[in-house]
């Protein structure tokens, strides 16, 4: 029986471990071929297809570090014969990859199933007929006995209609019946009142009169009690007005405080006099522009100076047209 032994690179560094693994998985009568799994996965070594009855993978690492690429699992599947086994230090969490490659996952190994033989299913040949021969129409048999009427939409007899109307009148569904005449019975409201219910004793208060015919005066206490009701209502209104006055008063105080603060801010603001707000006259001594050099000449004047083009002058000196007559000529 041909056996392929795939060794992890760490096994090669320890010859004693390699020999112990061979004794564990391989018997004396088996033909063994060993390769490093990296060389097999990278196609450096040529391995025959469908040749080995068993492939043993030896990996001394822990179980969670024994993973194999899905492509390598497919290669191992191709090395095995039908019903061949892949055993050894198998990865613990790649059963799905093994199934996708074609293996049948079992407890201690992965099995390559034997391919199922194809079964030929004979097809029934149609009888050849002459194309010119006309096709026969299907034949239907007529029933010997007519079936009974099962249509419930047949018209009812007069007795059935009478029975149905009587049932509708006896039940509450008579209100929804379409056979009603559409006339509503009017009820007289006066008949609902019984005359016996009207003969109840009415309590009539006695007149405030004395036996001698004089009217009894109301006592001071009653007058006070009657007045308390009015006083209570007025007190309630007064409380509401007082509450409203308090709210309005607090709002007025807040408005006054804000007005005082605004006045304080306005008092601190910078105010200009009329002399300061008037247009600057550069012909008057002490009045200067932003550059303070309007009287020196164009070389010292700013871009917006109104005296651009005029000769230099002294502050306070009157400028006449005769002085610049030569420049305009």
Curated annotation (Swiss-Prot):
Biological process according to GO: iron-sulfur cluster assembly
Necessary cofactors: [4Fe-4S] cluster
Region span, N-terminal SAM-like domain: 1-121
Motif, Cx2C motif 1: chain positions: 291-294
UniProt binding sites for [4Fe-4S] cluster: 291, 294, 302, 305
Free-text note regarding domains: The C-terminal domain binds 2 Fe-S clusters but is otherwise mostly in an intrinsically disordered conformation. The N-terminal domain has structural similarity with S-adenosyl-L-methionine-dependent methyltransferases, but does not bind S-adenosyl-L-methionine. It is required for correct assembly of the 2 Fe-S clusters.
Record's protein name: Fe-S cluster assembly protein DRE2
Lineage: Eukaryota, Fungi, Dikarya, Ascomycota, Saccharomycotina
């Amino acid at each position: 029986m041909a056996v392929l032994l795939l060794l992890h690179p760490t096994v090669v560094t320890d010859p004693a471990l390699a020999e112990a693994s061979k004794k564990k998985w391989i018997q004396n009568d088996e033909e063994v071929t060993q390769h490093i799994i990296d060389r097999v996965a990278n196609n450096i070594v040529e391995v025959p297809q469908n040749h080995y009855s068993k492939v043993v993978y030896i990996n001394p690492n822990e179980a969670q570090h024994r993973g194999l690429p899905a492509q390598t699992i497919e290669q191992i599947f191709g090395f095995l014969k039908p019903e061949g086994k892949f055993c050894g230090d198998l990865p613990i969490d790649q059963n799905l990859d093994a199934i996708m490659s074609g293996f049948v996952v079992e407890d201690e190994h992965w099995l390559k199933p034997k391919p199922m033989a194809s079964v030929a299913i004979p097809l029934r040949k149609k009888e050849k007929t002459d194309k010119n021969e006309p096709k026969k129409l299907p034949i239907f048999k007529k029933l010997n006995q007519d079936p009974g009427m099962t249509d419930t939409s047949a018209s009812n007899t007069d007795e059935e209609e009478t029975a149905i109307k009587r049932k509708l009148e006896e039940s509450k569904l008579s209100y929804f019946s379409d056979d009603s005449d559409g006339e509503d019975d009017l009820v007289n409201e006066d008949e609902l009142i019984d005359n016996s219910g009207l003969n109840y004793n009415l309590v009539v208060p006695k007149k405030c009169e004395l036996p001698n015919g004089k009217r009894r005066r109301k006592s001071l206490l009653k007058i006070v009690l009657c007045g308390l009701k009015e006083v209570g209502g007025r007190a309630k209104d007064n409380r509401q007005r007082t509450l409203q006055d308090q709210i309005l008063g607090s709002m007025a105080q807040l408005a006054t405080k804000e007005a005082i603060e605004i006045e304080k801010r306005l008092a601190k603001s910078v105010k200009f006099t009329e002399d300061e707000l008037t247009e600057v006259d550069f012909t008057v001594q002490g009045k200067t522009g932003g550059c303070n050099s309007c009287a020196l000449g164009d070389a010292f004047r700013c871009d917006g100076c109104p005296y651009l083009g005029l000769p230099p002058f002294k502050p306070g000196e009157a400028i006449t047209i005769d002085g610049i007559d030569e420049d305009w000529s």
